[in-house]
């Protein structure tokens, strides 16, 4: 049995790893053309709801995360099955629903532009019908040591600071750096 020493908010956690299912990965889900979709609370809250559902029903384990305006970073794994399958199902469902949310949002000033961009991207990808919300791939990076785990969690948490959204990582609402974050992570 292998162990990972996971440090979150200066606390060290011990987690056993099974090479087939419990490897920790740094993953990124990116909106097509880097479109800034996650500027509205309702879209962010929808992502939180779906990540929470996947934690409960698909055994998605999230150790750190941040929702930026056009991408999501996570340190994650799954208890059962394939992380790629879980993320693929998450992306398929959220793609359809977010597209509908944007299309039906009369308050969305960029609605027509975003819908056209997603439809255009979908037209050129044979894997899609009608539109493409997420870029293909999750860009998984295996986190093979405690130092790499710490580096990726630090990178995730400092992303909103580097973007100029907040002065300190713990101030960003949609991040595991915030102790009151709406998404509960494994600690």
Regions found by a protein language model. Give the residues of each.
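Short catalytic/metal-binding and nucleic-acid-binding patches
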Residues: 1-187
């Amino acid at each position: 049995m292998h162990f990972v020493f996971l440090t979150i908010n200066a606390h060290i956690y011990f987690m056993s790893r099974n090479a087939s299912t419990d490897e920790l990965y740094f993953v990124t889900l990116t909106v097509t053309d880097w479109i800034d979709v996650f500027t509205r609370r309702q879209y962010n809250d929808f992502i939180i709801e779906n990540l929470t559902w996947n934690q409960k029903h698909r055994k998605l384990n999230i150790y750190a995360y941040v929702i930026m305006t056009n991408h999501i970073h996570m340190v994650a794994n799954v208890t059962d099955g394939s992380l790629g399958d879980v993320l693929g199902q998450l992306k398929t469902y959220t793609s359809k629903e977010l597209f509908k949310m944007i299309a039906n949002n009369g308050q969305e000033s960029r609605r027509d532009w975003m819908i056209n961009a997603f439809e255009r991207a979908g037209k050129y990808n044979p894997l899609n019908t009608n539109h493409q919300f997420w870029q293909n791939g999750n860009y998984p990076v295996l986190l093979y040591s405690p130092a790499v785990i710490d580096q990726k969690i630090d990178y995730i948490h400092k992303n909103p600071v580097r973007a100029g959204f907040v002065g300190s990582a713990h101030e960003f609402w949609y991040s595991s750096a915030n102790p009151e974050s709406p998404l509960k992570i494994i600690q």
